[in-house]
Amino acid sequence: MTVAQVFVVGILVALVLITAFAVYTAFGPPSKKLADPFEMHED
């Protein structure tokens, strides 16, 4: 592999990991700690 291919693969792996972490945070067990500001707002 050339240096450019290693660089591109590294960036793609980083993007996949960031996306997986975001989905886990949004829908996994940590989502129980997230607050909904619209539910807390009084009209």
From Swiss-Prot:
<feature type="transmembrane region" description="Helical">
    <location>
        <begin position="7"/>
        <end position="27"/>
    </location>
</feature>
<keyword id="KW-1003">Cell membrane</keyword>
<keyword id="KW-0812">Transmembrane</keyword>
<keyword id="KW-1133">Transmembrane helix</keyword>
<dbReference type="Pfam" id="PF02468">
    <property type="entry name" value="PsbN"/>
</dbReference>
<keyword id="KW-0472">Membrane</keyword>
<comment type="similarity">
    <text>Belongs to the PsbN family.</text>
</comment>
<dbReference type="InterPro" id="IPR003398">
    <property type="entry name" value="PSII_PsbN"/>
</dbReference>
<dbReference type="GO" id="GO:0005886">
    <property type="term" value="C:plasma membrane"/>
</dbReference>
<comment type="function">
    <text>May play a role in photosystem I and II biogenesis.</text>
</comment>
<keyword id="KW-0997">Cell inner membrane</keyword>
<protein>
    <recommendedName>
        <fullName>Protein PsbN</fullName>
    </recommendedName>
</protein>
<dbReference type="GO" id="GO:0015979">
    <property type="term" value="P:photosynthesis"/>
</dbReference>
